């Protein structure tokens, strides 16, 4: 029987990120995906400006009731968007004693510079992170969660990971990607004692829309199969590295990663 994974996240109408990226990842990795929508994100055809439409809490809770009644082997969160949504998600995690939880602390839409809801950083930090098996911030998100200066080096990553770990996550995975001052695309996994590096060749591309969502979804999929966190991250790193390497142009504004790259190339 297929393992079941729930994503609590936003819908990206362009199909590259959010629950669309999650479901594509789940399908590619042979797990059964379910969704609970928190927001719908659209983009203007003229300049690709983002608009975020929140889903009502009552509608979100109805979705959660449905998904949890089916049974869930792992859970992943993406764009939650408000303190109320974070608290609702946390209540369902507690009620159903979920253990395999991947928190992708989404704070911005790709292409946007502003934090969507600045107050969500505090709620993510104080309410949700302590419930995570793995939390997967990028460099910007990690600096926000750790309340640190911008992260530029591997030592900066280690300091931020330790600060985030103190908030209660079992594992902290900071994604260095191509932004870190390092010869390779490096991600750092910290379990409170040991630092483990996951490396891949850097890819000079802007066609990486949905990379963070896809990476976290791949980790959740592998955890659902019973893999250790280290093995799940290693397999997910291989999956996302190939997906980024074969990212493609969707239109004049955006290019997503290719979820099928692991079997096509």
Regions picked out by a protein language model, each given a short descriptive name:
Residues 20, 144, 206-229:
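Short, small-residue alpha-helix embedded
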Residues 118-194:
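Conserved phosphate/ATP/ADP-binding segment of small-molecule kinases
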Residues 29-34, 196, 222-235:
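Phosphate-handling active-site elements
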Residues 8-14, 195-209:
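Short pre-catalytic strand/loop immediately N-terminal to key active-site residues, enriched for Gly-Thr
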Residues 2-7, 27-110, 114:
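Conserved N-terminal subdomain of the carbohydrate kinase-like
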Residues 15-32:
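N-terminal basic/disordered segments at the start of proteins
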Residues 230-265:
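Charged C-terminal helix
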């Amino acid at each position: 029987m297929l393992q079941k994974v729930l994503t609590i996240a936003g819908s990206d109408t362009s199909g590259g990120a959010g629950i669309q990226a999650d479901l594509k990842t789940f399908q590619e990795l042979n797990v059964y995906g379910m969704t609970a929508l928190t927001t719908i994100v659209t983009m203007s055809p003229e300049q690709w400006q983002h608009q975020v439409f929140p889903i009502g809490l009552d509608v979100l809770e109805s979705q959660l009731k449905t998904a949890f009644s089916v049974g869930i082997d792992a859970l992943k969160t993406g764009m939650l968007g408000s303190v109320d949504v974070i608290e609702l998600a946390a209540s369902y995690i507690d009620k159903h004693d979920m253990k395999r939880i991947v928190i992708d602390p989404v704070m911005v839409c790709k292409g946007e510079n502003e934090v969507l809801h600045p107050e969500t950083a505090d709620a993510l930090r104080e309410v949700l992170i302590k419930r995570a098996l793995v939390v997967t911030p990028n460099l910007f998100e990690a600096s926000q969660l750790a309340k640190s200066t911008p992260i530029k080096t591997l030592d900066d990553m280690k300091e931020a990971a330790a600060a985030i770990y103190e908030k209660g996550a079992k594992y902290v995975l900071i994604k260095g990607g191509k932004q870190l001052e390092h010869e390779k695309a490096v991600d750092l996994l910290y379990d409170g004692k040991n630092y483990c590096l996951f490396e891949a060749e850097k890819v000079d591309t802007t066609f990486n829309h949905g990379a963070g969502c896809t990476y976290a979804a791949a980790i959740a999929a592998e955890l659902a199969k019973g893999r250790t966190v280290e093995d799940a991250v290693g397999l997910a790193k291989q999956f996302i590295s190939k997906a980024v390497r074969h990212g493609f142009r969707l239109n004049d504004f955006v290019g997503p990663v290719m979820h099928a790259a692991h079997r096509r190339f």
